[in-house]
């Protein structure tokens, strides 16, 4: 796998947001200012709460297929590699890592089975579209922490995706979650969200390395980044953090990330969060 110098561009865009010349201007600007060679588009799906079975990937909160195909072609025309990461979010604001149901079925409660049916339909829909678009890497979700122990369902989802898509398949676990995905063998590429404290980036990469070597898979940070706020270098993805803007603190975190990456060639790069 070629090293990724990427950006997650306009993730979870609602219907219409990726259409038109203005967004293409932003894509060109991103390419010019960052030197990125890869862009990740994150078409979204939504469910009402973390305990809701129904997943909607066709409504107003989601990107239309034709928009995604058009912005993908625009990125390719700029010489960018394009990955897709279809991702589900909760409309009530709960982080998707908390999506979960009882591990034993109860008649009057929501269940894993219908939820995974919907999630598999969501991923398989975009897998078929990715095949049409010639997408190099399809990342089957992000930070789905409380679902990851459902090994049988995840393997079935991956199998469904592979039935319509012959490109490489990845999964993006959360920070600190690299050791807890029991089905890494079913994907081609391992990925996680690299939101580690500024003084612990290197030690966490050293923790991850044996897992990657054992799996014999490429690994990269499908997300990484730090807020521009005092205190953010210790909790780089805590969007609730309150404080004064601090460009230097943000810069210090990015410099630490890049320095750690330069001395660890087994890490196949990162895609910064927009």
PLM regions and their residue ranges:
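Active-site neighborhood of glycoside hydrolase catalytic domains
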Residues: 121-122, 137, 146-172
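Distinct, well-ordered alpha-helical segments
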Residues: 19, 95-96, 149-158, 173-189
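Short, acidic/polar
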Residues: 16-32, 116-129, 174-183, 251-260
């Amino acid at each position: 796998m070629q090293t990724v110098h990427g950006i997650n561009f306009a993730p979870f865009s609602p219907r219409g947001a990726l259409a038109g010349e203005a967004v293409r201007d932003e894509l060109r600007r991103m390419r010019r200012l960052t030197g990125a060679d890869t862009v990740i588009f994150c078409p979204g799906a939504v469910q009402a709460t973390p305990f809701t079975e129904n997943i909607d990937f066709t409504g107003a909160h989601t990107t239309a297929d034709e928009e995604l195909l058009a912005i993908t072609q625009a990125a390719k025309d700029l010489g960018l590699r394009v990955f897709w990461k279809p991702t589900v979010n909760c409309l009530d604001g709960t982080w998707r890592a908390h999506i979960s149901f009882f591990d034993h079925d109860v008649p009057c409660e929501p269940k894993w089975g219908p939820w995974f049916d919907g999630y598999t339909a969501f991923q398989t829909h975009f897998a078929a579209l990715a095949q049409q678009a010639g997408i190099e890497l399809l990342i089957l979700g992000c930070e789905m922490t409380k679902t990851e122990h459902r090994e049988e369902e995840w393997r079935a989802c991956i199998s469904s995706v592979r039935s319509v898509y012959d490109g490489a398949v990845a999964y993006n676990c959360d920070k600190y979650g690299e050791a807890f995905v029991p089905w890494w063998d079913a994907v081609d590429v391992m990925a996680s969200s690299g939101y580690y404290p500024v003084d612990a980036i290197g030690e966490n990469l050293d923790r991850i390395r044996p897992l990657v070597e054992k799996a014999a898979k490429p690994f990269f940070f499908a997300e990484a980044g730090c807020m521009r706020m005092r205190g953010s270098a210790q909790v780089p993805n805590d969007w609730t953090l309150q404080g004064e803007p601090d460009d230097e603190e943000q810069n210090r975190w990015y410099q630490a990330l890049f320095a750690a990456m330069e001395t660890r060639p087994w890490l196949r790069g990162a895609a910064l969060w927009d």
